[in-house]
Amino acid sequence: MLLDGDLLRHLKHLEVERRLAARTLANYQEAFKRLQVFAESAGVALREVQPHHIRRWAGQLHFKGLAPGSIAIELSAWRGFYRWLGRDGHVVLNPVAGVRAPKAPKPLPKALAVDQAVLLADQFDHADSPLLEARDHCMTELLYGCGLRVSELLSLDAQASTQAAGWIDAQDASAHVLGKGSKRRSVPVGGAALRALAAWMEVRGELATTGEAALFVSNRGTRLTPSQVRSRLKLRAIKAGLPTHVHPHMLRHSFASHLLQSSGDLRAVQELLGHASITTTQVYTKLDFGHLSKVYDAAHPRAKLKPPLE
């Protein structure tokens, strides 16, 4: 189709003065063709287009299945055209100025299948250092079995104290963590994680430097960093033969997904993840810890393993 004179002159401006690449110019030309078709179908001249026209046309593009990102590019091209017309005094109002593309849907969090998560947790590398294997096994169990954020995991201290941001109480099978916004919460710890914790605590002293409070320490004996956890978990997933890139937050997603699938209790899962309004003086808003423990024990696949014997 033959483009309107204004559109042709604007394309020339983009080519000569803005020096846009040929491929970019071709994309702009397609966007302008659609703008002209919309205007002709509405019986309105390009210089007389109003914001309600643009909103309707953007809606039609969305209805036809054009991705929000592509619609945003389309609107950007149209917006630039009307800005250019405005500089020459041909239009008073830029009809695209206040129009935004539909928001792109947030991607669903990726979670492992139950059998993949269990395989990852149960992975044992005989070639690895027994100390590192015990540590990594414990970290994996807590990330998946408790749904901890990596920051919460690494803030755990080996012993409870007034200075500790987080700790695990093996006696009442709970992890006490400081989450986002300095909000404390308690999360039940299942039998598999307690067994892994006991095994790690037996050898932790061989790595930790004197006086180091951190539950999880590096080869240097100091508190682990998030990047070190990501690296070790990635390696563990590769050795387990998992076909996907695994990171700590994926285990948190897996925790939530598997628990919700089994229990259907959205409110309990929300509390366990720390997504509710939890303050430092009130751990839970509406659900008591006993109810959360019951939901966890009945639904989470790693909670059903027996804890270590004294």
Regions found by a protein language model. Give the residues of each.
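Conserved catalytic core of the tyrosine transesterase superfamily
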Residues: 1-310
